[in-house]
Amino acid sequence: MAEKFFLKGEDKVNMEGVLGSEAVEFFSWSASNHMLTEFTSSRGDLGVQQALCKIVEGSDWTYAIYWQVAKSKSGKSALIWGDGHCRETKIGQGEGANDSAHQKMMDGNKKKMVLQKIHTCFGGSEDDNIAAKLESVSDVEVFYLTSMYYIFPFDKPSSPSQSFNSARSIWGSDLKGCLEHFQSRSYLAKLARFETLVFVPLKSGVVELGSVKSIPEDQNLIQMVKTSVVVSNPPQPKANTKIFGRELSLGGAKSGPISINFSPKVEEELSFASDSYEVQAALGSSQVYGNSSNGYRSDEGEGKLYKEELDERKPRKRGRKPANGREEALNHVEAERQRREKLNQRFYALRAVVPNISKMDKASLLGDAIAYITDLQARIRVLDAEKEMVGDKQKQQVILEIDFHQRQDDAVVRVGCPLNAHPVSRVLKTFQEHQVVAQESNVSLTENGELVHMFSIRAPGPAAEDLKEKLTAASRFALKTRWSVSVIRLLCFARLFVYEHQCLAGKFALYFVDYTI
């Protein structure tokens, strides 16, 4: 299959012109790794066609796709095309309205050629070649038909698999955010002018809805999709399949909306049980993708997926039962699968706690997580530094030296503290810079409970104004100057404790406090 999709020269240019470089790269990877060969689904009607048609018709939705869970022989799981329905597009919708008729015909032929190329590369037959039976192909139809050959493995990040693994719906009504979640289909979605994208997880798959209109989030619609889209079990093959609204068995084609119940043919046929579409959700916590400004946010989905049924389907080794009831890997492939699933679960958990995610791939997620952790570490260092500064200030405030000296008729209390810890330290430093000596200093208590520290200084007339400005800037308190005497009132809100000392001569009131600087 890889050799069939080898492109060169003009073929590659035409493919990239219609699909975009990311989609071409995806199909090259899928073909080289035989993805559609490894993951196959049961043929026939899944029983969701009528429900998908009901959701799209009579509403603003353009298409609906059901991605079903499939498993490979190696035990890997992926979401592959299950069924779909697309509304019939009007002429010119999703295309340039001013293009000439000849240009539209040339573009239409190029689109049909690209679709036929994809169909042939992935093992399709001429009988079910949809593009060959169409008269014209719109951009919406190109997007829809190309999606048939897409696959979303659980070990690679993608919006459909992320919605299924987290059991939460994704609703996007922002054009930029929609293109981000379309990922490799973003070029096709941009040409089709889709503005709304929704992923709704179910028990056995994911329903994708798209619209060319901006549709606000509606929880009732999500619940309706969960209850109406029910997969038949087991699926029964359908005799006459309608593809793109036309009967493939006979030539009598009639126009109508696109209703595809089709699985691309592959070179190898793998058989799986039809009831093996249930995979344990990788994460159960709430998760936000992007921010609320771009229209994207996750919602509660079906949280419980049946792990017990999965465990019953796992093959077991014969012989002695493992100790403590622990399940052992059957072989290296099974061990590798379990390791990948565990790694993916941790990536989903990491994505849930990182607030800003630039892209959906693992490398970008790790880069965003590293940047987020580095920012948190810087914040911690700043907070620790502020905490130390606050602690140092508190220590300085409590370091006081109190000396009591008794005299004959009174007593003197001397309270000493470091200069930097004193409220008037800036004022005193300003005095020292200007070589000003305080002639008198006293402390008094006002009726309002304010402690007033007053200084009487003497300075020359011209220097008084300069000193006044610097003292105002240093202490941020009012300064009043009268003749050559400046009185600085420093209001310090504090409590004045009056102590009484019992001695032989009687009680003495401590009325004077002298600060030692």
Curated annotation (Swiss-Prot):
Subcellular location: Nucleus
GO annotation, biological process: defense response; negative regulation of gene expression; regulation of defense response; regulation of DNA-templated transcription; regulation of jasmonic acid mediated signaling pathway
Official protein name in the record: Transcription factor MTB3
Main location: nucleus
Gene3D superfamilies, sorted: Helix-loop-helix DNA-binding domain
Pfam families: bHLH-MYC_N, HLH
GO CC annotations on file: nucleus
Region feature (Helix-loop-helix motif): 341-376
Ranges of residues in domain bHLH: 327-376
Keywords: Jasmonic acid signaling pathway, Nucleus, Plant defense, Transcription, Transcription regulation
Region (Disordered): 290-331
GO-annotated molecular function: DNA-binding transcription factor activity; protein dimerization activity; transcription cis-regulatory region binding
Renumbered residue ranges of the record's region Basic motif: 327-340
InterPro entries associated with the record: AIB/MYC-like, bHLH_dom, HLH_DNA-bd_sf, MYC/MYB_N
Stretches with biased composition (Basic and acidic residues): 297-314
Reported induction: Induced by wounding, feeding with herbivorous insects, infection with the fungal pathogen Botrytis cinerea and infection with the bacterial pathogen Pseudomonas syringae pv tomato DC3000.
Functional summary from the UniProt entry: Transcription factor that negatively regulates jasmonate (JA) signaling. Negatively regulates JA-dependent response to wounding, JA-induced expression of defense genes, JA-dependent responses against herbivorous insects, and JA-dependent resistance against Botrytis cinerea infection. Plays a positive role in resistance against the bacterial pathogen Pseudomonas syringae pv tomato DC3000.
Transmembrane segments: none
Disulfide bonds: none
Native source species: Solanum lycopersicum
